[in-house]
């Protein structure tokens, strides 16, 4: 089983490409955002510490943590943001490592539901030190003008919001230097799909 990290800037089209991979390969796909949901939900490993830190005002009517309310609570509060991240990031990493170990065990014993690939997607894979977790890091590149157009059309983002998000992410050069494979998703999807097929076929030959 091969573990592949998938990263890239906002609006690069990672989700669409992962849908293609999921349909065409024996794989498991884990989104870091989904992992953060799991560890924060009621009964999750950091639910109680987060509520203790932020207070019950961040809970919704069912007792779950309202992520929008939490974001508003820590917005422009650097110290509190740091304390929240100090809880979330290690818990997410632990969740991911457990998922990887689970799939490795299935592959080792030849389980019926064993997979050939484990794809881990997150915008912060490189910054958060996941190079040591994955066998290969993929950077989904997309021309900035195309990304802006996608974000405006699909999410209704303003230029100001897009600029704010971009300023907090790695530069293209940093993404490229931290990755083994670059998939150019600036053009049509069929071309990106072809690059994916070639990258996986090349990996199998190594």
Role assignments for model-derived ranges:
Residues 12:
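ATP-binding Walker
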Residues 15:
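Walker A/P-loop
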Residues 37-114:
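ATP-dependent small-molecule kinase phosphotransfer cores
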Residues 9:
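P-loop (Walker A) phosphate-binding loop of NTP-binding proteins
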Residues 27-40:
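Short beta-strand-centered segment that lines the nucleotide-binding/catalytic pocket of NTP-utilizing
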Residues 98-117, 131-140, 144-157, 167, ...:
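NTP-dependent small-molecule kinase module
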Residues 6:
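Hydrophobic anchor at the beta1->P-loop junction of P-loop NTPases
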């Amino acid at each position: 089983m091969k573990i592949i990290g998938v990263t890239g800037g906002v609006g690069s089209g990672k989700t669409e490409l992962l849908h293609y991979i999921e349909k065409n390969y024996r794989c498991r796909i884990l989104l870091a955002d989904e992992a953060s949901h799991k560890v924060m939900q009621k009964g999750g490993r950091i639910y109680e510490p987060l509520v203790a830190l932020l207070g019950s005002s961040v809970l919704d009517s069912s007792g779950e943590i309202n992520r929008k309310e939490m974001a508003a609570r820590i917005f422009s509060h650097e110290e509190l943001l740091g304390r929240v991240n100090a809880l979330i990031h290690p818990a997410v990493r632990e969740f991911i490592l457990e998922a990887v170990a689970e799939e490795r065990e299935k592959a080792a014993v030849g389980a019926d539901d064993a997979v050939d690939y484990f794809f881990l997607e997150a915008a912060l894979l490189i910054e958060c030190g996941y190079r040591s977790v994955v066998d290969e890091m993929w950077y989904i590149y997309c021309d900035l003008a195309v990304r802006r157009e996608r974000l405006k059309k699909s999410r209704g983002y303003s230029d100001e919001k897009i600029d704010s998000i971009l300023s907090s992410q790695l530069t293209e050069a940093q993404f490229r230097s931290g990755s083994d494979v670059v998939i150019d998703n600036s053009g049509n999807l069929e071309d990106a799909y072809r690059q994916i097929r070639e990258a996986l076929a090349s990996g199998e030959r190594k």
